[in-house]
Amino acid sequence: EYEKKLEAETFFTTHEMATITVLADIIIPKDEVSGSASEAGVPAFIEFIVKDMPQHQTPMRGGLKWLDLQCFERYEKAFKDCDSKQQLAMIDEIAYPEKAKPELKQGVAFFNLMRNLTATGFYTSEIGVKDVGYLGNRPNQWAGVPDEVLKQYGYSYTEKELKECI
C-alpha cells in the first residue's frame, strides 16, 4: 500500500523529469552492450526514490534548478534545451569533484547525487543486471567429500550415495 501511495504521487515537474532523463543518459548512455539509463527506467526510479527518501528532494530539485540557471547564464536556455556539446561542457565542469572550481561545489554535490541514483537505478534494473552479466545464484558441481577426509573419519560413501548424490 505504501508503494502504491508513492507511485500515485508526482514530485518532479515534466521539465525536471526531462532534465533528469537527459542527465541519466549522459551518465549511462546506450552502447553496444546495453541500453541507456532512460531505457532501464532510471528517471522513474529517481522519481520513486525521492518520494520514498524525502531527504533527496531538496538536493535534487535545487540541483536541477542550479543546473538550469548555470545554462541560462552561459547559453540562454535550460539545460535540457542545450545541444549535446553544451550539455557535456556543463557536466564536465561538475562531474570531477577534484577538478571542479570552488564556486561550482553545489553543482558537484548535485551531480554526485544524480550519478549515484542513476547508477543504483540502472544496475538494479533488468538491463543493468544483464550489462554486468550477473546470472544470479547458481548451484556448482560438488564431487563430495575428498576420499582422504572420509578415511580420516572412518567413513566411506555407499554405492547408493555415490549413485544418487554425487
Residue ranges and their predicted role:
Residues 1-22:
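C-terminal segment of N-terminal export signals and the immediately downstream linker at the start
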Residues 4-5, 22, 41-166:
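Mature-region segments of soluble proteins
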Residues 22-23, 29-30:
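N-terminal secretory signal peptides
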Residues 28-29, 96:
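Residues at helix-coil transition
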Residues 34, 38-39:
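Zn2+-dependent metallopeptidase catalytic domains
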